[in-house]
Amino acid sequence: MQDKIRDLTQGDLSSHLYRIALPIMGTSFVQIAYNITDMIWLGRLSSQALAAVGAASVFLWIAASFALINKIGSEVTISQGIGAGRRDEAKSYASQNVCMSLLLSVGMLAIYLLFAGNLLDLYALIPSVRAEGLSYLYLSLVGFPSIYLTASFTGIYNAIGDSRTPFRISILGLATNMLLDPLFIFTLGWGVSGAALATVVSQGLVLLLFLYQVKRDKLFGGFPFLVRLHWTQIRRILQIGVPPAPLQVLFAFVSIYIGRQVSTLGGHIGVATMTTGAQIESLTWNTASGVTEALTTIVGQNFAAGKLRRVYTAFCRALSFTLIIGVLGTILFVFWGEEIFALIVPEEAAYKAGAVYLGIVGLSQAFMMLEITAEGLFYGLGRTYLPAAVSIVGTYLRIPMVLLFASWGWGIRAVWWAISISSILKGLTMLYFFLRWRHRTREERRQQSLA
């Protein structure tokens, strides 16, 4: 275990950043591939099947958002414990995060069993689409414990600087999902239900592999999964992990509201465009999120060790990389949006509508990189509330924007422009807070040197 824990307070920052970020980015792409694999096969069934899964996926996204409590909680509490030289504390936080994530998954599963139908009714779908969406949602509930525990284990490995293990395990899960999707959906004729079952089986395999790997690696000399929860540590985990979790939930609620507007303005083609377009767009923001998670770990260790100059340098190097990704995303989405969308949905009406979506949201990609990278900095500092507040306010601005732009007669484009403009505003706001933090820390260092 000792060689698995990397000291990120020493050595070349670029090397640390890319060594940790690349496997995390790979893991993010695996998650994208999970979703796009389902979309590709379901797109071959019908656009209605795609709309059904897209609507159900929003609520699965809400559930998965709560897994961030322990994923981010693990990354920050454990990395800061390692950076400060408190290994026993880091070990205890590992146990607390895993046990807490299991309890959260069971609670969320119970809530969804009771209210799944009511939640899906928020989309006002036609009966046939609603029925398929409900089937997909119910079957997906089986995978909740796997999702939550996997998120916690991933956070633990990221915190110690070993992002390769989650990547390798995720690859095996993806391979399983890609093999099972066509078998369950077409060969066995299970359709939408087959897509859900393929994903659940893959998630279960990933969890089993994590359990085996953690035991084999003897992380922190071996730590128990089921423990008595200690309020002091749980409170710290909640302080760090809770702000990003409601952020994703509230973001999903906005998506539900906007989804209703899209359904009204564009029917099931509009819903399929938004949900599929979001999966395509995730190619850029998931890449940036991989860098952000690596940045969180590096910042966590160096901040706890009092090395603020390395914190600042790590942020600048991460941002230079994500901005390149953002500019490339803009070029691809604006100029080749139709061709990209047609790879997933072969229906002409759908991929032409998708090209309009990608062309508009593509304009905001670089600004989205600013927001996401700054999140990684503030997460590592333990100040998760700041990016959460910026994102919540910026995301909720989409609602009045949609109403305003729609009143101008923009049709469904009103929704796409609201998404793009709000992303630009959030990126600029996070840049402002970063500059303010840098100025304040420089002043503090200057005062300390004078003293």
What kind of feature is each model-predicted range?
Residues 71, 139-158, 166-177, 195-208, ...:
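Short runs within selected transmembrane alpha-helices of multi-pass transporters and secretion channels
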Residues 1-24, 78-145, 187-242, 299-364, ...:
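Short alpha-helical transmembrane segments in multi-pass integral membrane proteins
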Residues 39, 47-50, 87, 163, ...:
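Membrane-helix interface/capping residues of multi-pass secondary transporters
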Residues 33-36, 44-47, 81-84, 159-160, ...:
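Helix-loop interface residues and adjacent transmembrane-helix termini in multi-pass membrane transporters
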Residues 62-65, 177-182, 207-211, 282-286, ...:
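Hydrophobic transmembrane alpha-helices of multi-pass small-molecule transporters
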